[in-house]
């Protein structure tokens, strides 16, 4: 092949653009290893003596289907030097495969996130499980942050919030919180959580425990606060007097205060602190 000027010129051009992409295995048998840049694809190719009039032969293929590699080679071997064109087509195929693989991985991650086991948020599910423990002093397992109680026309509102990083921790947090007999005896325990999974998906849910639309409002609040990895429960002890829409103001106010104390929404907390300093 040393006397084949077209082949030698092609080798020099390839080496200048893609160094070491075409290396000899045996110069006597005119076999070379072709490596596709930025990929694991390698091909062992044998060149005929009358190349480029005759097409090279794919002996072995690694990282790509051999039949596909042969078909692509035959499509560009038209009587002129073809390794440049061959590499470009193979690289395009490799890039497409990589994009498809990435898309499939992302789709799989999304499916796994969508398959998260739903959390049973209703109070009765937890309180009924631990009746004998309700008389014991509460020894919380989670780092709960509490809002200041808000009392309006004999109804009292108070929030508890803690950091959670999975739906399993949400379940554990609920079990932990309902060990507090005061919380367990509340007329309504509205809950919401918002988790950002490692792949960036948002996992969230809420329950209003009979206080219509309260859970969804709390969930919306967490989104507006850009809160991450947090669970919040607002308890209401009903005093017998209906207070109308004001209850939603107290629920959101309590939830916001407790969430800020967990540092789950640092940007919101900075804004609040800045506002307080400004008032002074």
From Swiss-Prot:
GO cellular component, one term: cytoplasm
Predominant location category: cytoplasm
SUPFAM superfamilies: Ribosomal protein S5 domain 2-like, UBC-like
GO molecular function terms listed in the Swiss-Prot or TrEMBL record: actin binding; protein sequestering activity
Intracellular or extracellular location(s): Cytoplasm; Nucleus
This protein's record includes keyword Nucleus: yes
InterPro entries found in the cross-reference section: Impact, Impact_N, Impact_N_sf, Ribosomal_Su5_D2-typ_SF, RWD_dom, UBQ-conjugating_enzyme/RWD
The keyword Nucleus appears for this protein: yes
Alphabetical keyword list: Actin-binding, Cytoplasm, Nucleus, Repressor, Stress response, Translation regulation
Domain RWD: 9-109
Function of the protein: Translational regulator that ensures constant high levels of translation under amino acid starvation. Plays a role as a negative regulator of the gcn2 kinase activity; impairs gcn1-mediated gcn2 activation, and hence gcn2-mediated eIF-2-alpha phosphorylation in amino acid-starved cells and subsequent down-regulation of protein synthesis. In normal conditions, it resides in a actin complex and has no activity.
Subunit structure: Interacts (via N-terminus) with gcn1 (via C-terminus); this interaction reduces the gcn1-gcn20 complex formation and prevents the interaction of gcn1 with gcn2 protein kinase and gcn2 activation in amino acid-starved cells. Interacts (via C-terminus) with act1; this interaction occurs in a gcn1-independent manner. Interacts with rpl39; this interaction occurs in a gcn1-independent manner. Associates (via middle region) with ribosomes; this association occurs in a gcn1-independent manner and persists under amino acid starvation conditions.
Protein name, UniProt field: Protein IMPACT homolog
Organism: Schizosaccharomyces pombe (strain 972 / ATCC 24843)
Protein encoded by which gene: yih1
């Amino acid at each position: 092949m040393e006397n084949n000027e077209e082949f030698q010129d092609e080798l020099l051009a390839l080496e200048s653009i893609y160094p070491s992409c075409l290396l000899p295995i045996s110069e006597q048998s005119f076999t070379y290893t072709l490596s596709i840049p930025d990929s694991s694809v390698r091909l062992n190719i044998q060149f005929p003596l009358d190349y480029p009039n005759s097409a090279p032969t794919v002996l072995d293929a690694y990282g790509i289907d051999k039949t596909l590699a042969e078909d692509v080679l035959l499509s560009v071997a038209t009587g002129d030097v073809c390794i440049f064109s061959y590499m470009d087509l193979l690289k395009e195929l490799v890039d497409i495969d990589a994009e498809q693989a990435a898309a499939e991985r992302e789709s799989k991650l999304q499916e796994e996130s969508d398959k998260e086991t739903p959390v049973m948020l209703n109070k009765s599910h937890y309180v009924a499980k631990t009746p004998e423990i309700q008389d014991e002093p509460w020894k919380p397992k989670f780092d709960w942050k509490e809002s200041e109680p808000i009392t309006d026309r004999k109804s009292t509102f108070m929030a508890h919030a803690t950091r959670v990083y999975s739906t399993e921790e949400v379940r554990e947090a609920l079990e932990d919180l309902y060990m507090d007999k005061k919380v367990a005896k509340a007329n309504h325990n509205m809950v919401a959580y918002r988790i950002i999974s490692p792949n960036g998906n948002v996992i969230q849910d809420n329950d209003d425990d009979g206080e219509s639309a309260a859970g969804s409002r709390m969930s919306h609040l967490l989104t507006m606060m850009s809160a991450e990895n947090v669970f919040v429960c607002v308890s209401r002890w009903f005093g017998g007097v209906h207070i109308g829409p004001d209850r939603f103001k107290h629920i959101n106010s309590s939830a916001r205060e407790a969430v800020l104390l967990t540092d789950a929404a640092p940007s919101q907390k900075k804004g609040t602190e800045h506002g307080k300093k400004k008032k002074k």
